[in-house]
């Protein structure tokens, strides 16, 4: 990916763990617009760029001995969503990738924007089951746009509210809680099915 997009790897960071691989990126924003986490406003539509859970499924397939699949490629060699980022740069009010899990990453947007949300679980397409919304490594985008600029070309999963709470809504009876990867905390897991944040 670094060669494809002519990005030299430089930088540093610190984290608890036996192996550290760090990436720092410097650059000029497209159209001088930076999509941040803190711009969501009451009434904005919450969207995602793709179904959730492909990387989780890819990991499961890889561990089961399957050699190649689209899901495995999405897990082992995720592609940055530069074209989508460019296409929403003029209309999105906030944006984040879903590498830590859709719900936990969306919560970053809501917390930083000091807003809440109604999330329509029935609208979220998943690869395996509804727990995919907590699976990480998808590297797709979750973003907010003003309702009057939504044209139906992205997956609409909710709406921003001003009450600073998150309401998960499902007519199908889905019952989930917000989980996902938390940086700088010890995370014990063997497979995605028994991921626990301690």
Language model regions located:
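Short, compositionally biased
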Residues: 57-74
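Residue-level signal for inorganic ion chemistry
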Residues: 9, 43, 97, 143, ...
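Glycine-rich anion-binding loops of enzyme active sites
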Residues: 1-61
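Active-site-proximal betaalpha loop/short-helix elements
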Residues: 75-138
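Short hydrophobic/aromatic beta-strand micro-patches
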Residues: 26-28, 142-146
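Acidic, Ser/Thr/Pro-rich beta/coil linker or hinge segments at domain junctions
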Residues: 76-79, 151-198
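Solvent-exposed alpha-helices and their adjacent loops that cap or buttress functional pockets
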Residues: 15-18, 38-41, 65, 86-89, ...
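Short, conserved charged micro-motifs
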Residues: 34, 147-153
